[in-house]
């Protein structure tokens, strides 16, 4: 995996955006005489001694090596790593001008047709199935970790990083959920572990729950649990077994709502990523060939 240290220039003195556990920098990569816009993601952490930093960097690089080998149209490519943006090595990926799925839906929700929405969902389901076929669990599938390219395609990013970030910062999923991802996290990951110090580990089943939340978000233009303004309220709702409520508007067709509920069922009864991808693509095919459906 290439070390791009010394090949990047920051476009500003400060990070462009801040995630729950990381910072994003917009940079220019000087490559073979041309300039390419890239995003540099650095994992935030508390102060560590040099020995601990080296140990965690080795762990991070092992995980990133898996990402660097992945090749799929709906997976954000990892160009390499870079030092100098924090205590740990940082990731270098393409810069997506259309930003995240959440931001894209906020900006375009009024104009997106049902076909266009299912095209986005088809991209997400295809990327997720590919990850699972490579024995990779995403672990943090949210509207912020799906990026939209200039041609309007959706690409999955940051898979596997949530577990590392939680380890590095030394917190549980329950605590990290309050950093803005709780609306997409499977309930079993928020359960208080029986053993002290143990932490819940994401699985393909928990990814499917999160996909159900993405499906909800794309069809409605609203995040799951939109009726609650604060994430702490969402945590309480999940602890009580309350699932996101079905909005009156926009209308979600019964068969789509039924499939969302399947994704939110108890973990052993959720569909596989292959079944999810087949369902989404069958719905897209039907919409594209239904003469009564709006474009």
Give names to the regions the model predicted:
Residues 207:
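Conserved catalytic-loop aspartate of Hanks-type protein kinases
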Residues 149-183:
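Activation segment/activation loop of eukaryotic-type protein kinase catalytic domains
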Residues 120-121:
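Activation segment signature within eukaryotic-like protein kinase domains
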Residues 77-89:
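Short beta-strand micro-motifs within the conserved protein kinase catalytic domain, predominantly
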Residues 23-48:
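Glycine-rich ATP phosphate-binding loop
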Residues 132-149:
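Catalytic-loop of the protein kinase fold
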